[in-house]
């Protein structure tokens, strides 16, 4: 999670400004509108100061354990899942993770990505489904 934050925080000031956020989102969704980016940014900018700090970034990508459906956090997590699920089949492969991390400037090997999948792949199908993705994001948060 920290690596993703740092890759979006281009000027390395510890805050993600709207322009930095928009640039990162457009890498994956070139046709997204500014209005859609605004909605996502507002969800992440919890304190409303016009910038996203690392705590806001991490906390908003985590789903609260209360089981509420369609919370804003759940929606943001689903949008993040959809970015990784490049072929739209409802599951994420190690190669999809590798491509996304590479686009974000991360230096993970394919083997690293296979291990990421294996770590959370509870049903042993070789892919990460949405529930497993949430576990993966939570474990990333705890390890940073």
From Swiss-Prot:
Potential calcium sensor. The keyword Repeat applies. GO terms for molecular function: calcium ion binding. This is Probable calcium-binding protein CML31. Pfam families: EF-hand_5 (PF13202), EF-hand_7 (PF13499), EF-hand_8 (PF13833). Keywords: Calcium, Metal-binding, Repeat. Residues 1-31, 32-67, 72-107, 108-143 form the EF-hand domain. Ca(2+) 1 binds at residues 45, 47, 49, 51, 56. Ca(2+) 3 binds at residues 121, 123, 125, 132. InterPro entries: EF-hand-dom_pair, EF_Hand_1_Ca_BS, EF_hand_dom, EF_hand_pair_protein_CML-like. Ca(2+) 2 binds at residues 85, 87, 89, 91, 96.
């Amino acid at each position: 999670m920290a690596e993703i934050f740092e890759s979006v925080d281009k000027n390395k000031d510890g805050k993600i400004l709207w322009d930095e956020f928009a640039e990162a989102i457009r890498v994956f969704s070139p046709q997204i509108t500014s209005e859609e980016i605004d909605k996502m940014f507002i969800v992440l900018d919890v304190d409303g100061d016009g910038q996203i700090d690392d705590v806001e970034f991490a906390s908003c990508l985590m789903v609260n354990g209360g089981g509420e459906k369609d919370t804003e956090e759940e929606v943001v997590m689903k949008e993040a899942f959809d970015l990784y699920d490049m072929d739209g089949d409802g599951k994420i492969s190690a190669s999809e993770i590798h491509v996304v991390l590479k686009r974000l400037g991360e230096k993970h090997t394919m083997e690293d990505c296979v291990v990421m999948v294996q770590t959370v792949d509870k049903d042993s199908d070789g892919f990460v489904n949405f529930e497993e993705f949430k576990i993966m994001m939570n474990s990333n948060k705890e390890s940073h």
